[in-house]
Amino acid sequence: VEIFIGKGVGSILFGQDEQQIINQLGRPDKVYELEGSKRLLYFDLQIEVAIEYEHENKFGWVEVKNPDATLFGQKLIGESIEKVLSVVSAAIAHTPEYEDCGSLEIYFYESLWLELQFELNRLRSINIGVLFIDDNTPDWP
């Protein structure tokens, strides 16, 4: 599965509604609510899709934990912080915000809505969201 910053992951695109996601990926293995969104979990794909209530119940955020997923053409899940940041820095000219949460370290590229979560020096999750035209207006692909 390929991750497309600002667009989506694989065949699903930001801006699609829940039924469109289900039509493409099938029924989710688990559904729960979190922080103003409905979360659809797909165990085999190892992704968590967020349907955001504040944005007309559209797909606006995804968490990817699949080790076969690619970002900028490379498989990065499980790789070291140094390697991942090197690959990302070569592809984009942005400096991330850094947050140390103990065993979890987060690098967030706000202008790209790209979040990299590391645990024990290894990338555990690549999270991306829809880009915004302004503070409240999503730029749907």
Sequence positions of predicted segments:
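Short helix/turn-capping signatures at newly exposed starts of structured segments
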Residues: 1-141
